[in-house]
């Protein structure tokens, strides 16, 4: 008798719409691979009842809070249900850009200079020291919520007088916000599948940076896989990504986003432990380059669930 698989999709985070698309694609791919899979939306179904509903395994196609941040993973562990992707701690750390950066920095891995602010600090007014630290980053900077995905709440700030509005927007989505030095080179993403590192993808957005619209709505964003790196650069990138992945304790599948700055140095941006699986998504693109169909990819991700 084959396992009955729940594909968790939708949910209640800011990335609900993306997750619905991801989940629908995953569901179709699993069924194509002969898997007995069913959609479950935590917004509409009590996921504490998954076991009593007869499910033996869970494919997490949720993005953002409540699906990618360790809370759901902890619940599934208490229920004794195997699930795809990283465990509780690695999921929580990867969702938190600030703590990811602190860990990577502590491990000697390259990250862009940044300043972190809390909502309380912002509301009471920034100190001279904080203002000096922000000023030292130069312009432009990227302002982003620490625990939000899909570039939700993110802004590029090119003038000092635009910083307050960018911070206000970011603080609508989180209690902690990062202000990062702008890196001028191309962005890459590298997918990991079990023990295998897939070919890197180079991202060329039509606008000034890879925001929500460029990720999910624009047909003008260009993706290159292979990424066009020299063999030695690709090897360096893969080695960096593997170190970043293991430092956070990630497993199963996911991807890590990286920038190549004008100085020729790769800088780690963030880890994604439940990446998008839509028509614009990058893990399926990398898997295709490695000779794997979408259906084979999702079946393999499910096989890695524990």
Swiss-Prot record:
Name of a matching Pfam family: Dala_Dala_lig_N
ATP-grasp domain mapped to chain residues: 101-303
Record's GO cellular component terms: cytosol
Main location: cytoplasm
Catalytic activity: 2 D-alanine + ATP = D-alanyl-D-alanine + ADP + phosphate + H(+)
Cofactor or coenzyme needed: Mg(2+); Mn(2+)
Disulfide-bond pairs as recorded: none
Keywords: ATP-binding, Cell shape, Cell wall biogenesis/degradation, Cytoplasm, Ligase, Magnesium, Manganese, Metal-binding, Nucleotide-binding, Peptidoglycan synthesis
Keyword Cell wall biogenesis/degradation: yes
GO biological process, one term: peptidoglycan biosynthetic process
Signal sequence coordinates: none
UniProt keyword Secreted present: no
PROSITE patterns assigned to the protein according to its UniProt record, in alphabetical order: ATP_GRASP (PS50975), DALA_DALA_LIGASE_1 (PS00843), DALA_DALA_LIGASE_2 (PS00844)
GO molecular function: ATP binding; D-alanine-D-alanine ligase activity; metal ion binding
Location(s), subcellular: Cytoplasm
SUPFAM superfamilies noted in UniProt: Glutathione synthetase ATP-binding domain-like, PreATP-grasp domain
Residues that hold Mg(2+) 2 according to the record: 270, 272
NCBIfam families, alphabetized: D_ala_D_alaTIGR, PRK01372.1
Family to which the UniProt record says this protein belongs: Belongs to the D-alanine--D-alanine ligase family.
Function: Cell wall formation.
Protein name as annotated: D-alanine--D-alanine ligase B
Organism name: Escherichia coli O157:H7
Lineage of producing organism: Bacteria, Pseudomonadati, Pseudomonadota, Gammaproteobacteria, Enterobacterales
């Amino acid at each position: 008798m084959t396992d009955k698989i729940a594909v968790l999709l939708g949910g209640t985070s800011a990335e609900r719409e993306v997750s619905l698309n991801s989940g629908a694609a995953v569901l179709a791919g699993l069924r194509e691979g002969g898997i007995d899979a069913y959609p479950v939306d935590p917004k509409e179904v009590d996921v504490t009842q998954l076991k009593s509903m007869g499910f033996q395994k869970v494919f997490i196609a949720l993005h953002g809070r409540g699906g990618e941040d360790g809370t759901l993973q902890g619940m599934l562990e208490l229920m004794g249900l195997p699930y795809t992707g990283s465990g509780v701690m690695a999921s929580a750390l990867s969702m938190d850009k600030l703590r990811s950066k602190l860990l990577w920095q502590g491990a000697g891995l390259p990250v862009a200079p940044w300043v972190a602010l809390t909502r309380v600090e912002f509301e009471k007014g920034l100190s001279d020291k904080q203002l000096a630290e922000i000023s030292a980053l130069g312009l432009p900077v990227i302002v982003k919520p620490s625990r939000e995905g899909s570039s939700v709440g993110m802004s590029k700030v090119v003038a000092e007088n635009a910083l307050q509005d960018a911070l206000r927007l970011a603080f609508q989505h989180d209690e902690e916000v990062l202000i990062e030095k702008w890196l001028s080179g191309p962005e890459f993403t590298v997918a990991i599948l079990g023990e295998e590192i897939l070919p890197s993808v180079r991202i060329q957005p039509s606008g000034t940076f890879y925001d929500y619209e460029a990720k999910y709505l624009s047909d003008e964003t260009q993706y290159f896989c292979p990424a066009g790196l020299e063999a030695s650069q690709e090897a360096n990138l893969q080695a960096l990504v593997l170190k970043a992945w293991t430092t956070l304790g990630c497993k199963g599948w996911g991807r890590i986003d990286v920038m190549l700055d004008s100085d020729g140095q790769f800088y780690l941006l963030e880890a994604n432990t439940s990446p998008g699986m839509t028509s614009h998504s990058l893990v399926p693109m990398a898997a295709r380059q490695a000779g794997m169909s979408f259906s084979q990819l999702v079946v393999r991700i499910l096989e890695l669930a524990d």
